[in-house]
UniProtKB/Swiss-Prot annotation:
Chief place of localization: plastid
Organism ancestry: Eukaryota, Viridiplantae, Streptophyta, Embryophyta, Tracheophyta
Function: Usually encoded in the trnK tRNA gene intron. Probably assists in splicing its own and other chloroplast group II introns.
Keywords: Chloroplast, mRNA processing, Plastid, RNA-binding, tRNA processing
Protein name: Maturase K
Keyword Plastid: yes
Organism (species): Rhododendron ferrugineum
Designated gene of the protein: matK
Length: 506
């Protein structure tokens, strides 16, 4: 990595606009393949000691283009046969190296922009804020005072040319963009690489980093409108003039359809101090203390912005307006609700006493049991009704490996859903996994569950399923020995960076 940084220490005034030569740097591809494939494939087999080999990369690109016009779509074929060989290696491997290396090159301008932004600024590194659980204390603190919420599913780009057009505002090197446009448009299979799948994307396994970069950039452009409106409602804070003029042009496009001609009036309509925005992957939440009319204006505004700026039809049904008092938010695997908690206060005045009834709003997070049963059923731990089953594919493992796998799955689920207000759903998941583990072991030893547990002892399974790692966490409940309060205590851990997926239990 240090060598990579030294190679990138160029004059920034020149490097900002010219990233095309970096495509022909071999260390770029070695860096891209540092985790996974052999990182020195190019260096070991080319015979060159220098770090730049224009000829071999150029020949490789020409070879890929020739193969494309021969309608031999080897890039994402299921079998890696010997018919697609180039320089003694499989062409799939080289195509993957090109696209992953290209992803590294395109990320460089954004990395340099971040470094220039952080220069001269002292920022506290809070790695714990990267945890997914860190968002729930924020929701608990803010959402209990809000009224309406917009459930937003971010649309996918129907044409990759839209991504190129937005990318050119940040990457000034026309040569690199032309090469990117060529690969995205000339391969017929590109059209099926990014396909809508619920609220996210289905990426190619071989080129996940490349398309993940394009998707994140697309989402970043979607969210730019929120930053713009926030800056405008805060008395025109410092903002890029290019972005400002670009948004002005957008208002001119749709002013006859949506707004009045007064630009200040446009900003005033959306000046809302109690507006909060949260997003994870392709799903976002926009909550406000305003009225239903204001939320409908927001919905209409967002739909028109996405249609005019991205030149695509944005379905209004992808944005739902709900009232927090009677709606549950399905976000990050939790069901979040804002409910009224009755509160009775007894007031004593000399000889008379009064009972005052009041209600306060409380933000609750619950673990949805139905989707979890569905996930466990899909992974063959139980049936659709939640009845535990054995895991035949694990019967060939040792007893300790089987118990450790089941225990690890439960600990991961318990770790993630520790913020659930009620733990009964988690106890049911524990029951399913424990009995599934026992049935798997009994199947392996050709015995009954009762006989096997009698010989093994229930305590061993209990030990594996209750073992917990020592990590930092946040809890807002008062310390108490009352079992009822302990049952309802919520714990937010600071080491969770992704939603637990049963599909990755292997």
């Amino acid at each position: 990595m240090e060598e990579f940084k030294r190679n990138l220490e160029l004059d920034r005034s020149q490097q900002h606009d010219f990233i095309y030569p970096l495509i022909f740097q071999e260390y770029i591809y070695a860096l891209a393949h540092d985790r996974g494939l052999n990182r020195s494939i190019f260096l070991e087999n080319t015979g060159y000691e220098n770090k730049s080999s224009l000829l071999i990369v150029k020949r490789l690109i020409i070879h890929l283009i020739t193969q494309m016009y021969q309608q031999n779509h080897f890039l994402f074929s299921g079998n890696d046969s010997n018919q697609n060989k180039f320089l003694g290696y499989n062409t799939n491997l080289y195509s993957q190296m090109i696209f992953e290396g290209f992803a590294v090159v395109v990320e460089i301008p954004f990395y340099l922009r971040l470094l220039s932004f952080l220069e001269g600024k002292e920022r506290v590194k809070s790695h714990n804020l990267r945890s997914i659980h860190s968002i729930f204390p924020f929701l608990e603190d803010k959402f209990s005072h809000l009224v309406y919420v917009l459930d937003i599913l971010i649309s996918h780009p129907i044409h990759l040319e839209i991504v190129i057009q937005t990318l050119r505002y940040w990457v000034k090197d026309a040569s690199s963009l032309h090469l990117l446009r060529f690969f995205l448009h000339e391969y017929p299979i590109w059209n099926s690489l990014i396909t809508p799948k619920k609220s996210s994307f289905s990426f190619s396994i071989r080129n996940q980093r490349f398309f993940l970069f394009l998707y994140n950039f697309h989402v970043c452009e979607y969210e730019s409108i929120f930053v713009f409106l926030r800056n405008q409602s805060s008395h025109l804070r410092s903002i890029s003039s290019e972005t400002f003029l670009e948004r002005i042009s957008f208002y001119r496009k749709i002013e006859l359809e949506v707004f009045t001609k007064d630009f200040k009036a446009i900003i005033w309509v959306f000046k809302e101090p109690f507006l909060h925005y949260v997003r994870y992957r392709g799903k976002a939440i926009l909550a406000s203390k305003g009225t239903s009319l204001l939320m409908n204006k927001w919905k209409y505004y967002l739909v028109n912005f996405w249609q005019c700026y991205f030149y695509m039809w944005s379905q209004p049904r992808r944005i739902h307006i709900n009232q927090l008092s009677n709606h549950s938010l399905d976000f990050l695997g939790y069901l979040s609700t804002v409910r009224l908690k009755p509160l009775m206060v007894r007031s004593q005045m000399i000889e008379n006493s009064f009972i005052i009834e009041n209600a306060s709003k409380k933000f609750d997070t619950l673990m949805p049991i139905t989707p979890m049963i569905r996930s466990l059923s899909k992974a063959k731990f139980c049936n659709v009704l939640g009845h535990p089953m054995s895991k035949p594919v694990w019967a060939a493992l040792s007893d300790s490996d089987i118990i450790e796998r089941f225990g690890r799955i439960y600990r991961n689920l318990s770790h993630y859903y520790s913020g659930s207000l009620k733990k009964m759903s988690l106890y049911r998941i524990k029951y399913i996994l424990r009995l599934s583990c026992a049935r798997t072991l009994a199947r392996k030893h050709k015995s009954t569950v009762r006989a096997f547990l009698k010989r093994l002892g229930v305590g061993l399974l209990e030990e594996f399923f209750t073992e917990e790692e020592q990590v930092f966490y946040l809890t807002f409940a008062k310390a108490s020995s009352n079992s009822g309060e302990l049952y309802q205590r919520r714990v937010w851990y600071l080491d969770i960076i992704c939603i637990n997926d049963l599909a990755n239990y292997e």
